[in-house]
Each structure stands twice: as structure tokens, then as C-alpha cells.
């Protein structure tokens, strides 16, 4: 027969449960953005791509890396292809006089970045600061 301990069952069920993670990036620093994109890859490897939902929310000065001329445009596109969400704060876009045509294709938009992060946390998502 097969003996499974309560601890093993708890670990298996917690691994099987879909993880939901929101990552805030509010800095224009390339190294911080690279780190946030690495988080996505690492978390997808850890949990399995289909077992984790990840959204990076860019606000404040961090929104620049989602512009069409971003030095990380290729990495952002790769992250989107892997199924992670990248959302730009429309409040920040308005303040910085950015339009959707200034931004990378296929990203998402949220009315307020902080509001989105608060909503995700209220819905049980884990929070990571990029």
C-alpha cells in the first residue's frame, strides 16, 4: 500500500493550488525591471506555468519600460508570450502625457496602478515589490 502523511498531502495540495502573484514596479531602473521579469520566469518554473497567474503592474517612473522604445522591449514581449500580464497605470500615463500608441503592443492597462495592486491583494494575490 501507499502511506501518505498529512504533511505530504498539505504540500501536494498547496503545490497544486493555483498561485496568484502581483508584482509592483515603480522605478525606471533597468536592473529592477530585469529582476521583476526574472521573478516571472522563476515563479513559472517553480509552480509550473499553468499553476501560477502573474501580473506586473507598472506605475510612476516604472512605466517607461513599457514604452515602445524600451531597452527591455524583447524581454517584455517574451514575458507576455509566457502568459504573464503586464499592466500600465493610466493615471501615470496621463500625468506623463503618454498615449497607448506610445506603449508596447499587447500590454494591459489599469485605471490606477495602486488601485489594481490593492484589488489583487484583497482578492488573495501575493504581493512582490520589484
Model-derived segments and their meaning:
Residues 4, 8-130:
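Secreted/extracellular ectodomain signature
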